[in-house]
């Protein structure tokens, strides 16, 4: 079915920054995708093309990327007349048109918008939901697996104001019977946590961060974990809900000293208190011994390979590479060879096409890694990643707290998918790391 029209426009993400929205029109109607954007971006990611005009949006405009879709990509794609159902061919064409390894010419934000909108057009042409089409593209087996929602309920690091260095603390409802039950448990714990935060740290502690989590003025990881543990207990789920952390440690790595500064938000932090990677690894292990931690993301800086490999050898929980791997096939290959981590954080906008995202997941599965599909801190009402998580059988999705519409949009979409699939789906639960094999 030919493409009648490709049109991009500038819209906004949840942080008030511009992003690219793409419409693809075929005989089945209009198919739309919006590209997310991150705050802490890894240096090995595909290029998010920004205008750089400081007079508008502080330089963060995407009018160049929009123009690239409307004047270059769209006309070329229509002329090429590729079948929208052949996603690999479409994405290969987009990459060739760009001509760079990191999509720096046309912009990964321009290319991804088109790639995802095309996938939606293809699903419509086949008369199936998007997750079914993605499952077909990836060749995943049935039944469908619904992911465990990793819910970021407490924010620190670059996402929040207090001294807390670690960026995200997530609750993981991995003993629930179903996705909807897991989400309910998460929502109940979140409400308790909000009330606790206000009571202990004052009314403003109930204010939410970019991803919907609370951001009280917390100093240490222990303090954060104690608060979450108390909320889990108050909700009646002690022993039933696990915890995960995204440390985002590249944000507080001192490259020259090769040390980690847990007081990085303080301009006068004391260099004698900075930690070596061994000391930081010991801190993680002591936390995991005391709290039900099942997953740690970005425990070390993105190029501190030695630290990752050291930690991997001595840990049994899930170690997720985000800044380390940036959904990039070459980085994933290196991480597999160096035995650096055992799970991939999959962010479609880090690599820039659906085909490459699917391949990144398959490469990870092939080495028995887990795959966690992830939102970005700058999100929109687009729910594509919910379908990707189900279509890829990833078994785990990270899309913020059960708060703020741009986060809940994805979780609500999985509720709909769960209802639609009924008995034909299983909840990943405790098997979230190996759900592709369920």
Swiss-Prot record:
Keywords: Allergen, Cytoplasm, Glycolysis, Lyase, Magnesium, Metal-binding. GO terms for molecular function: magnesium ion binding; phosphopyruvate hydratase activity. It is found in: Cytoplasm. Its main location: cytoplasm. Mg(2+) is required for catalysis and for stabilizing the dimer. The active site is at residues 211, 347. Belongs to the enolase family. This is Enolase. The gene is enoA.
């Amino acid at each position: 079915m030919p493409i009648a029209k490709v049109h991009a426009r500038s819209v906004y993400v949840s942080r008030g920054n511009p992003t690219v929205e793409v419409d693809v029109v075929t005989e089945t109607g209009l198919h739309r995708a919006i590209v997310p954007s991150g705050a802490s971006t890894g240096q090995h990611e595909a290029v998010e093309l920004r205008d750089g005009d400081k007079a508008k949006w502080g330089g963060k405009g995407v009018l160049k990327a929009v123009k690239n879709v409307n004047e270059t990509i769209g006309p070329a794609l229509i002329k090429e007349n590729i079948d929208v159902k052949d996603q690999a061919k479409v994405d290969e064409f987009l990459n060739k048109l760009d001509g760079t390894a990191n999509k720096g010419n046309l912009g990964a934000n321009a290319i991804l918008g088109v790639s995802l909108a095309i996938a939606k057009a293809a699903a419509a042409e086949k008369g199936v939901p998007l997750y079914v089409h993605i499952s077909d593209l990836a060749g995943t087996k049935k039944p469908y697996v619904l992911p465990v929602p990793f819910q970021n309920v407490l924010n620190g690091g670059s996402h929040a104001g207090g001294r807390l260095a670690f960026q995200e603390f997530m609750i993981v409802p991995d003993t629930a019977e179903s996705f909807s039950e897991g989400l309910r448990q998460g929502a109940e714990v979140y409400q308790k946590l909000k009330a606790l935060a206000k009571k202990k740290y004052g009314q403003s502690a109930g204010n939410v961060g970019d991803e919907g989590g609370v951001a009280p003025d917390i100093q240490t990881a222990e303090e954060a974990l104690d608060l979450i543990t108390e909320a889990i207990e108050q909700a009646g789920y002690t022993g039933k809900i696990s915890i995960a952390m995204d440390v985002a440690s590249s944000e507080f790595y001192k490259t020259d000293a090769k040390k980690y500064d847990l007081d990085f938000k303080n301009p006068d932090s004391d260099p004698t208190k900075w930690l070596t990677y061994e000391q930081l690894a010991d801190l993680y292990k002591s936390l995991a011994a005391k709290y039900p931690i099942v997953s740690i993301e970005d425990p070390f800086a993105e190029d501190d390979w030695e630290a990752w490999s050291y930690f991997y050898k001595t840990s049994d929980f899930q170690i997720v590479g985000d800044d380390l791997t940036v959904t990039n096939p070459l980085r994933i290959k290196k991480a597999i060879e160096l035995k650096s981590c055992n799970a991939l954080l999959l962010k479609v906008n880090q690599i820039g096409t659906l085909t490459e995202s699917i391949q990144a997941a398959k490469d990870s599965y092939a080495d028995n890694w887990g795959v966690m599909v992830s939102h970005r801190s700058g999100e929109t009402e687009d729910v594509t990643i919910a379908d990707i998580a189900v279509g890829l059988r990833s078994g785990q999705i990270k899309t913020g707290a059960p708060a703020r519409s741009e986060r809940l949009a994805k979780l609500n979409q999985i509720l709909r998918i769960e209802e639609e699939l009924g008995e034909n789906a299983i909840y990943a639960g405790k098997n979230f790391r190996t759900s592709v094999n369920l």
